A protein has these predicted regions:
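Glyoxalase I/VOC metalloenzyme domain signal
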Residues: 1-37, 44, 49-121, 128-224
Length: 224
């Protein structure tokens, strides 16, 4: 099985930081994950990866302290500031994944066995899009939200994919205001609008969306 290119912009991969990428990769394969064939050429980084949902990939990265993997294969555009001002408190929070009807249990098993994610109680909710099941990683600082189609959508063609990235921020409305000044547009409707709990951007390039969730940055503490 190989990953096929698509015409519309999508979330095609994400990476997890590990102490030993090869060891994590081998363990994932032993647990049943499907590996991605090595395609790195001479002088290119070989980053081990497994198949994720749909056509997406999940990479294992163990080089991130001294330099970024992007420093090896990419050069910054000369006219662009390589270190733009950061928005205070903005951090990665999680990923929203769409799954097929009655497929939530399968993905819970996948993420639990290979990455140590655990389901959260239904009463635990973040942001303004509360559907689906939340999974929490072992360090309690990254989340996956699995959403099945509901209503009549359950009977239509169901695509499984990574739908959007969530960013945590201690002040959602202040972050929305700063991002709007940078040209980011947010949804404003009767059902979906920015609040102190969260916000959702309008789709960009046809299909790419981002979500803001109220969350204070905190140190990673492993689950006991």
């Amino acid at each position: 099985r190989t990953v096929q290119p698509v015409e519309r912009p999508i979330l095609s991969a994400f990476a997890v930081r590990v102490g030993d990428a090869d060891a994590a990769f081998q363990r994932a394969k032993e647990l049943g994950a499907w590996e991605i064939p090595v395609r790195a050429r001479a002088m290119e980084l070989n980053i081990p990866a497994i198949h994720g949902v749909g056509e997406s990939l999940i990479y294992f990265v163990d080089r991130y302290d001294e330099f970024s993997i992007y420093d090896v294969d990419f050069h910054a555009t000369p006219t662009v500031d390589p270190h733009p001002p950061a928005i205070e408190g903005l951090h990665f929070f999680g990923i929203v994944q769409y799954v097929g009807p009655d497929r939530t249990a399968d993905w819970v098993e996948f993420y639990s066995q290979i990455f140590g994610f655990k389901p959260l109680p239904d009463a635990v909710r973040f942001g303004i899009m509360p559907k689906g099941l939340l999974l929490e990683n072992a360090y309690r600082n990254f989340y996956l939200q699995l959403i099945e189609p509901d209503g009549i959508a359950r009977f239509g063609p169901a695509e499984e994919d990574l739908q959007r990235i969530g960013f945590g921020t201690p002040d959602v409305l202040a972050t929305v205001a700063l991002l709007e000044k940078r040209g980011i547009e947010f949804l404003t409707s009767e059902k979906v609008h920015s609040s102190d709990r969260g916000a959702l951007t309008k789709s960009s390039l046809g299909s790419v969306m981002f979500e803001l969730v109220h969350d204070d940055p905190r140190p990673a503490v492993a689950r006991k």
